[in-house]
């Protein structure tokens, strides 16, 4: 939009509506924002904004509210994000540094982001490119069952119980573990299935069945795709905004619960020069999140995984964008340590 005054008026309408949830009239705009023009001039500009599809009159109200297109213009006009306060930054750092493993980091991150933004927060587990095998442990749990434990450099421990035709004694178990480690230690997770293939044929007869079962378990554990997992927090926050979803909040909650929709959307979102991506309402597609907005950004190596929030289109975009970006940066730093 090239008209500076209309941009200013649109910005004021968005800010007032987000704050009050009440349609905004020309007189209120002039008084509240001390605009150096008359109410009649503002009404003319509002008529032009409405004709452009940026604001709309709900029902018979004399005031106007932003449309999805109006929010988009508003968001695109945000030149720089306001940094968080020193207290907020310290709180994020302390909160995340208290985590003891990857699962705890993920849980803490979404809880923190939900608290900061008062929206529903989501985080995608880190993509595993470059993650290698740190250790493999085999534990005899009795009754011919062995617990196969895979410990990758990402810190997320995975385990799987396998039943053996014959139990192994301690010496056999140690030998099998040594053979397995010789194959996979330091290997990337993607290569583990190929590295354990054929292992059983190289083992002594007494270990072949166990070697085959352990190899199968390791292949499954290594192939388990953490990047297709989401952690969520703050969905109860959406209930406070149920009136902001014209049809029903149910499709939004179902999309969050189903995860597939969220993962597909997050993977398609590309952050801009400000370091965030914003999807507003139905501007791109008609899906279960067509009445919601999503603010997300990448974190970790190459910003390949996403973290963000979901809320109504009537959202405090500048504050939300700044919070999402800040949390992602601290998260990247935490995981890189």
Swiss-Prot record:
InterPro entries: GAF-like_dom_sf, HrcA, HrcA_C, WH-like_DNA-bd_sf, WH_DNA-bd_sf, WHTH_transcript_rep_HrcA_IDD. Signal peptide: none annotated. Pfam families: HrcA. PANTHER family: HEAT-INDUCIBLE TRANSCRIPTION REPRESSOR HRCA. This is Heat-inducible transcription repressor HrcA. Belongs to the HrcA family. GO terms for biological process: negative regulation of DNA-templated transcription. It comes from the Bacteria. The gene is hrcA. One of its GO terms (molecular function) is DNA binding. Keywords: Repressor, Stress response, Transcription, Transcription regulation. Negative regulator of class I heat shock genes (grpE-dnaK-dnaJ and groELS operons). Prevents heat-shock induction of these operons. The keyword Transcription regulation applies.
């Amino acid at each position: 939009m090239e008209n500076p005054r209309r941009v200013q008026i649109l910005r004021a309408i968005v800010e007032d509506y987000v704050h009050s949830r009440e349609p905004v009239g020309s007189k209120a705009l002039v008084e509240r924002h001390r605009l150096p023009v008359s109410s009649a001039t503002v009404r003319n500009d509002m008529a032009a904004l409405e004709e452009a599809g940026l604001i709309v009159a709900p029902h018979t109200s004399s005031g106007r509210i932003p449309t999805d297109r109006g929010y988009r213009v508003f968001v695109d006009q945000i030149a720089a994000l306001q940094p968080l306060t020193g207290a907020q930054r310290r709180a994020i750092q302390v909160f995340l540094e208290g985590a003891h493993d990857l699962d705890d980091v993920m849980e803490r991150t979404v809880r923190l982001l939900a608290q900061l933004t008062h929206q529903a927060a989501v985080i995608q587990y880190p993509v595993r490119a470059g993650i290698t095998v740190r250790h493999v442990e085999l534990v005899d749990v009795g009754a011919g069952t062995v617990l196969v434990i895979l410990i990758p450099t990402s810190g997320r421990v995975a385990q799987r119980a396998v039943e053996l035709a014959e139990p192994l004694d301690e010496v056999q178990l140690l030998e099998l573990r040594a053979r397995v480690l010789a194959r996979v230690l330091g290997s990337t997770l993607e290569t583990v299935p190929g590295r354990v293939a054929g292992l059983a044929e190289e083992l002594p007869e007494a270990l072949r069945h166990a070697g085959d079962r352990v190899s199968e378990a390791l292949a499954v554990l290594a192939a388990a795709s953490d990047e297709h997992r989401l952690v969520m927090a703050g969905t109860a926050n959406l209930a406070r905004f149920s009136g902001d979803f014209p049809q029903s909040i149910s499709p939004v909650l179902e999309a969050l619960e189903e995860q597939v929709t969220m993962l597909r959307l997050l993977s398609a979102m590309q952050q801009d020069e400000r370091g965030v991506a914003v999807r507003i309402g139905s501007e791109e597609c008609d899906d279960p999140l067509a009445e919601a907005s999503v603010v997300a950004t990448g974190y970790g190596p190459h910003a390949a995984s996403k973290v963000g929030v979901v809320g109504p289109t009537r959202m405090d975009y500048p504050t939300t964008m700044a919070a999402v970006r800040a949390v992602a940066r601290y998260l990247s730093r935490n995981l890189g340590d």
